[in-house]
Amino acid sequence: MKTSRKITTQRRHRRIRRKVFGTAERPRLAVFRSHRHIYAQVIDDVAQHTLASASTLDRELREKFKETGTATQEAAALVGRSVAERALQMGISRVVFDRGGKLYHGRVQALAEAAREAGLQF
């Protein structure tokens, strides 16, 4: 029987999480992509604490998605820019990137590149 896409994504995410670990000096930028929305969090895994977050559900960003929708690369880029600005305000400039088991393509790639352009280093 063929392995489902969900199972392969979960396996890939477990494999990535074994290698990617966020600290206070260099937290983890975790990305979760659903069919409609995209979420990004800057996480300190040692303290198990979310330092900054942004998503397409944020009230500040919600008005910008009225024409384009939330499941687009433009929306992902806005979320990436927003989470990078929030992290930089907290004094975080270097992170490790956790793509959440998804391929580095499309919305995940757009979010990562926008976060880099906004000043995060990874």
UniProtKB/Swiss-Prot annotation:
GO terms for cellular component: cytosolic large ribosomal subunit. The keyword Flavoprotein does not apply. Pfam families: Ribosomal_L18p. InterPro entries: Ribosomal_uL18_bac-type, Ribosomal_uL18_bac/euk. GO terms for molecular function: 5S rRNA binding; structural constituent of ribosome. One of its GO terms (biological process) is translation. Keywords: Ribonucleoprotein, Ribosomal protein, RNA-binding, rRNA-binding. This is one of the proteins that bind and probably mediate the attachment of the 5S RNA into the large ribosomal subunit, where it forms part of the central protuberance. Belongs to the universal ribosomal protein uL18 family. Part of the 50S ribosomal subunit; part of the 5S rRNA/L5/L18/L25 subcomplex. Contacts the 5S and 23S rRNAs. NCBIfam families: L18_bact (TIGR00060). This is Large ribosomal subunit protein uL18. It comes from Synechococcus sp. (strain JA-2-3B'a(2-13)).
